[in-house]
């Protein structure tokens, strides 16, 4: 088949509504079939690649039907609200913006018993996946009393608009990829507020979240106490520090250094896995403390397979965790250490490989860039202290002394400046990850605070 014939055949395939193929294209053109599409036509055999005069390769791949977002299957049960138009802080207007969410419990007749749970960097809307032991009857996230909801952030691969979703909700425009616009923590919260409006929510009883989720929680507070009654930011910051910005840049650099990254214009069939894995390894070291890793691995060389220990807690039997920071408390797995000298190396390699199977590099860059925009004072006040002083809600700040990423000192700053705040410590030497694994402490601290701040909800009968 000649070059001209090949191009004509491709054009017909793209334009013909009865023929559905997915195109994985290594330049600027990308097309993914919609969720409702099926492969009904006979697709002629195409060459694996053609080259234009500049030598840029374009690969075509016939595939079975798949959803617009190739990662959506990893969060079964999630629902989508579509916002027709949304203008980002940058001024960019997005259209047909999907917002993925999951909810538990019932919305009260007054629509005022909403508990927002905000996920961390690599999380999804499935709270049961990463804070499952806190969710359910009689627990902190009591589904008999609260309408518990978690909404996925912009840039995440798990359902909300991101580099792996269709541009403006239209698969014919291709997916965003590297063209996904810069978004902020405030963008997320404003978008999620629109989603709550669509659900008929009138008032938020509590907003709770850790790490990036804690940043969202602090931004929710600026809707005022008449809309958000109380907040719980955990292991977070009032602004992204130079320390955290530096770690994020090191991770992004690892991804961009992968030869397969191609300035973000890679296909789903051959992503920059090694760069993403290197970024994940770097991040994992910021999520744990030195003492935690030393206690767990030491200088164990494990010349034979050795079973990874669970640290002290177990996940629900039906849990398949994919979104915790370090995977510290997963079901035990065997490490094959034949190709490494130390257990710590096997741990990092295993976690990085697992992460690269369920995350996207452009999404990782988009989300870490989002963290760097976080600054409560931006556009509001001259100083962070002044911005924090504007928060009126009862506030429970949770900090971890061993956290080297978002330090206890940063939590103390928040608690000092917010007029109606108190600081409580999660006691652990596991570092930043403690907010995801010290479930019994979290449950006890949260229930106590909710009884103080929301007695009308906590003391009433189940809905």
Swiss-Prot record:
Pathway(s) the chain acts in: Mycotoxin biosynthesis
Biotechnology: Fusaric acid is phytotoxic to plants such as cotton and banana. It has been shown to induce programmed cell death in plants. In addition to a mild toxicity to animals, fusaric acid exhibits acanthamoebicidal, antioomycete, and antimycobacterial activities.
Top class in the EC scheme: transferase
Catalytic activity: L-homoserine + acetyl-CoA = O-acetyl-L-homoserine + CoA
Domain of life of the native organism: Eukaryota
Active site, UniProt feature: 211, 403, 432
Keywords: Transferase
EC number annotated for this UniProt entry: 2.3.1.31
Gene3D superfamilies the record matches: alpha/beta hydrolase
Record-linked InterPro entries: AB_hydrolase_1 (IPR000073), AB_hydrolase_fold (IPR029058), HAT_MetX-like (IPR008220)
Ranges of residues in domain AB hydrolase-1: 113-436
Region of interest (Disordered), ranges: 296-331
Task of the protein: Homoserine O-acetyltransferase; part of the gene cluster that mediates the biosynthesis of fusaric acid, a mycotoxin with low to moderate toxicity to animals and humans, but with high phytotoxic properties. L-aspartate is suggested as fusaric acid amino acid precursor that is activated and further processed to O-acetyl-L-homoserine by cluster enzymes aspartate kinase FUB3 and homoserine O-acetyltransferase FUB5, as well as enzymes of the primary metabolism.
UniProt protein name: Homoserine O-acetyltransferase FUB5
Gene source species: Gibberella moniliformis (strain M3125 / FGSC 7600)
Gene name per UniProt: FUB5
């Amino acid at each position: 088949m000649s070059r001209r014939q090949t191009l004509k055949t491709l054009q017909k395939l793209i334009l013909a509504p009865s023929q559905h193929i997915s195109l994985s294209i290594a330049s600027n053109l990308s097309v993914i079939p919609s969720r409702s599409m099926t492969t009904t036509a006979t697709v002629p055999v195409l060459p694996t690649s053609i080259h234009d005069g500049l030598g840029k390769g374009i690969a075509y791949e016939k595939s079975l039907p798949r959803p617009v977002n190739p990662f959506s299957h990893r969060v079964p049960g999630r629902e989508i609200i579509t916002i027709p138009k949304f203008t980002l802080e940058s001024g960019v207007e997005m259209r047909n913006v999907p917002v993925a969410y999951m909810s538990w419990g019932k919305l009260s007749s007054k629509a005022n018993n909403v508990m927002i749970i905000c996920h961390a960097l690599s999380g999804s809307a499935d709270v049961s996946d990463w804070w499952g032991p806190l969710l359910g009857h009689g627990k902190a996230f009591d589904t008999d009393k609260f309408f518990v909801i978690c909404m996925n952030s912009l840039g995440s691969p798990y359902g909300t608009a991101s580099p792996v979703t269709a541009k403006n909700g239209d698969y014919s425009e291709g997916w965003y990829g590297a063209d996904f616009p810069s978004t902020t923590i405030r963008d997320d919260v404003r978008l999620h507020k629109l989603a709550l409006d669509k659900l008929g929510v009138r008032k938020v009883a509590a907003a709770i979240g850790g790490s990036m989720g804690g940043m969202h929680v602090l931004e929710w507070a600026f809707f005022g106490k008449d809309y958000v009654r109380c907040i719980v930011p955990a292991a977070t910051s009032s602004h992204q520090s130079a320390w955290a910005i530096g770690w994020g840049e090191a991770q992004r650099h690892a991804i961009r250094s992968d030869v397969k990254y191609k300035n973000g214009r890679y296909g789903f069939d051959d992503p920059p896995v090694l760069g993403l894995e290197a970024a994940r390894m770097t991040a994992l070291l910021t999520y744990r403390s030195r003492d935690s890793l030393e206690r767990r691995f030491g200088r164990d060389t494990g010349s034979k397979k050795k079973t990874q220990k669970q640290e002290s807690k177990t996940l629900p039997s039906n849990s398949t965790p994919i979104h915790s920071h370090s995977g510290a408390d997963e079901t035990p797995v065997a490490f094959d250490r034949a190709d490494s000298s130390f257990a710590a190396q096997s741990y990092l390699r295993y976690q990085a490989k697992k992460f690269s199977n369920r995350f996207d590099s452009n999404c990782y860059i988009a989300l870490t860039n989002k963290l760097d925009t976080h600054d409560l004072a931006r556009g509001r006040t001259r100083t962070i202290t002044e911005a924090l002083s504007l928060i009126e809600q009862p506030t429970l700040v949770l900090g971890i002394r061993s956290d080297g990423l978002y330090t206890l000192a940063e939590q103390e700053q928040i608690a000092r400046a917010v007029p109606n705040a108190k600081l409580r410590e999660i006691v652990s030497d596991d570092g930043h990850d403690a907010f995801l694994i010290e479930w019994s402490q979290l449950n006890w601290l949260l229930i106590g605070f909710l009884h103080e701040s929301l007695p009308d909800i906590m003391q009433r009968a189940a809905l």
